[in-house]
């Protein structure tokens, strides 16, 4: 019976680890989305004397960025559309709320798993005391 309990505890631990990884990924995405919202919402980009544009592989080129015109936004399957800065900020704010909701669901799921782990562990500990 002890091996079954150990296997069950290991399985729950792996689920908790997976949830933690998903939460970490979503937290990083949330920071990136919030940074983009901040960048589009304030005038720092327009007033910055030097702008570097990533061209990949850690290389950057100096360039000019105009965010007063439409932004080009990916909508999936390699398709892009033009979108106003204001519309982009609205969409990003909605994305941010969706990410926060997903994080909350994962935190709830994690709590359930931790409770389940503690219950299994306590039950086994009680059996071993008897």
UniProtKB/Swiss-Prot annotation:
The keyword RNA-binding does not apply. InterPro entries: PFD_alpha_archaea, Prefoldin, Prefoldin_subunit_alpha. GO terms for biological process: protein folding. It comes from the Archaea. GO terms for molecular function: unfolded protein binding. It is found in: Cytoplasm. Keywords: Chaperone, Cytoplasm. Its main location: cytoplasm. One of its GO terms (cellular component) is prefoldin complex. Molecular chaperone capable of stabilizing a range of proteins. Seems to fulfill an ATP-independent, HSP70-like function in archaeal de novo protein folding. HAMAP family: PfdA. Belongs to the prefoldin subunit alpha family. Heterohexamer of two alpha and four beta subunits. This is Prefoldin subunit alpha. It comes from Thermoplasma acidophilum (strain ATCC 25905 / DSM 1728 / JCM 9062 / NBRC 15155 / AMRC-C165).
């Amino acid at each position: 019976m002890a091996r079954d309990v150990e296997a069950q505890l290991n399985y729950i631990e792996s689920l908790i680890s997976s949830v933690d990884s998903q939460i970490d990924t979503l937290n990083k995405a949330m920071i990136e989305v919030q940074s983009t919202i901040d960048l589009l919402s304030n005038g720092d980009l327009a007033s910055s004397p030097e702008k570097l544009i990533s061209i990949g592989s850690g290389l950057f080129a100096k360039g000019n960025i105009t965010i007063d015109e439409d932004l080009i936004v990916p909508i999936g399957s390699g398709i892009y559309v033009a979108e106003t800065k204001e519309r982009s900020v609205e969409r990003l704010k909605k994305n941010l709320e969706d990410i926060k909701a997903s994080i909350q669901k994962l935190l709830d799921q994690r709590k359930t798993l931790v409770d389940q782990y503690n219950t299994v562990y306590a039950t086994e500990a009680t059996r071993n005391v008897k």
